[in-house]
């Protein structure tokens, strides 16, 4: 089939904000991006709130973004679904959750509720944890322990005090529940196979083995702050109150309240996989049940409360069925997003789909290596483009998001400058084979590095729109759109009809000229490599 080869470059965390105040994207020297933005059609699209299936005021994130991009339609998110279920009361009769509570009551065993205690809404929401505690209280459970993973990444770096106080107040009001441990998400929610981080969290949950203890959660947090730790990096701390055993034991029931899969998978595997080999587990509790709020993937055979509706005829499936070749490429931190999430929750590649995983650098935080593995990704991507094997390539560059999360303005600026070099190489490679490019982002982050309200580093995502830059034929673009419009736009570029299941709209309208104009402007926008 004769189609125009296309490249979708997703610059993770590369939002649009006109103010230069602590804006790493505007601060960066980026001659390639500036030339492309000047010379090619561009617009801004929405990547948060209702435009990606999230509640009003809720920032977008990588999982949500890639689901919407790959599906080519609005995909309602687990956050919204659980919020609605709590509001209409159906949450409290959810079969998987009800069965777990009933099993704990029947066996007079302990119920452990664990998850990211945060109002961030990216991986979890504290209101869901409060509702689960209420459900346990309604059932008359008294042995209920809460294991709070702390955020500081999708929330201000030191903001967990309020969340812990709210949880403690909820326990007091319901007369059930006790906070058994706190730990930063750095340890409990790794997604890069950094098992040396996960192991301390695992040992905290199963043995209470930790360097730090406290008599209550707020005191534990104060001690962590005194050690210079922010919420994300709070070292595992056991809350010791009385003689009761508050770690996970044989016969106990666990409910994991994170709804986003990518950072829930590793700790779940450590707690549930008999063949686990990430580290030596000194003690493995024989849990009566382990329930997840949402599905963490096809390879986890665990009961879950809310399953994602199947997405049929997303971009990857559709072009595969047409016999076309595609490539997905990213470094480790975003690999799941261009594969599993982009494919609507499908683990396995489609026929004709290749995948390239480039390992992320082994550093404590990515501000220590702002370029991350972008140049290695670019080397492999450039070779793939020049091989002329692929009709469509989906690539994610992680830098804007992962370095943006550090709150380090200088490092984030360096990250964007590294990306600019990569952008130049990729656009030139696509030019050489007569291909076309969309450059966009899944959500904002690096364009806002300081929270002027709190005067703390801004480490979270934003509500800002993201760029849509089309590098190809003469065209007119729709003035605005959303992430769901990217797949239809790619199909327009490829000259393919849009399947009925895709309800997004192409942002590209060709202006009566099918001849590429890349070479015509090369003299005044030649890209730096």
Name what the model sees in each region:
Residues 1-513, 518, 527-529:
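Feature captures the catalytic ectodomains and active-site-proximal regions of enzymes
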């Amino acid at each position: 089939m004769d189609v125009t080869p296309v490249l979708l470059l997703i610059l993770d965390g590369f939002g649009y904000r006109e103010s230069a105040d602590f804006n790493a994207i505007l601060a960066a020297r980026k001659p390639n991006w500036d030339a492309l933005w000047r010379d090619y059609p561009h617009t801004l699209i929405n990547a948060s709130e209702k435009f990606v299936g999230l509640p009003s005021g809720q920032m977008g994130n990588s999982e949500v973004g890639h689901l919407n991009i790959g599906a080519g339609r609005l995909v309602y998110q687990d956050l919204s679904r659980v919020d609605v279920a709590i509001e209409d009361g159906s949450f409290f009769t959810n079969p998987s959750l009800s069965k777990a509570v009933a099993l704990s009551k029947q066996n007079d065993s302990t119920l452990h509720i664990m998850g990211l205690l945060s109002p961030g809404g990216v991986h979890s929401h504290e209101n869901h944890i409060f509702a689960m505690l209420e459900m346990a209280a309604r059932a008359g459970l008294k042995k209920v322990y809460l294991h709070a993973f702390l955020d500081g990444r999708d929330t201000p770096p030191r903001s967990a005090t309020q969340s812990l106080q709210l949880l403690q107040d909820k326990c007091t009001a319901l007369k059930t529940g006790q906070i058994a441990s706190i730990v930063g998400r750095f340890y409990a929610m790794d997604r890069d196979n950094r098992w040396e981080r996960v192991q301390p969290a695992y040992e905290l949950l199963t043995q209470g083995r930790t360097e730090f203890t406290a008599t209550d959660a707020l005191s534990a947090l104060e001690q962590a702050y005194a050690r210079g730790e922010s919420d994300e990096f709070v070292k595992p701390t056991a809350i010791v109150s009385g003689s009761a055993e508050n770690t996970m034991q044989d016969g106990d029931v666990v409910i994991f309240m994170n709804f986003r899969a990518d950072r829930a998978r590793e700790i779940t595997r450590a707690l549930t996989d008999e063949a686990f080999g990430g580290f030596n587990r000194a003690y493995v509790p024989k849990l009566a049940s382990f329930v997840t709020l949402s599905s963490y993937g096809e390879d986890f055979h665990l009961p879950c409360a809310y399953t994602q509706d199947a997405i049929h005829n997303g971009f990857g499936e559709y072009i595969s069925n047409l016999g076309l070749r595609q490539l997905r490429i990213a470094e480790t931190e975003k690999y799941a997003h261009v594969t599993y999430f982009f494919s609507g929750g499908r683990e396995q590649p489609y026929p004709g789909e290749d995948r390239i995983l480039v390992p992320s650098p082994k550093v404590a935080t990515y501000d220590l290596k702002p370029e991350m593995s972008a140049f290695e990704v670019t080397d492999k991507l450039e070779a793939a483009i020049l091989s002329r094997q692929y009709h469509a390539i989906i690539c994610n560059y992680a830098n804007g998001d992962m370095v943006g999360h550090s709150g380090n303005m200088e490092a984030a600026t360096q990250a964007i400058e590294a990306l600019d070099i990569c952008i130049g190489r990729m656009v030139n490679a696509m030019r050489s084979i007569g291909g076309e490019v969309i450059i966009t982002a899944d959500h904002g982050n690096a364009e806002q590095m300081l929270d002027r309200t709190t005067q703390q580093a801004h480490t979270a995502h934003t509500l800002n729109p993201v760029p849509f830059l089309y590098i190809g034929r003469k065209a007119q673009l729709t003035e605005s759109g959303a992430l769901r419009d990217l797949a239809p736009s790619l199909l327009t570029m490829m000259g393919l009809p849009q399947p009925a299941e895709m309800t997004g709209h192409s942002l590209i309208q060709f202006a009566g000229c099918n001849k590429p104009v890349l070479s015509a402007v090369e003299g005044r926008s030649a890209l730096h490599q």
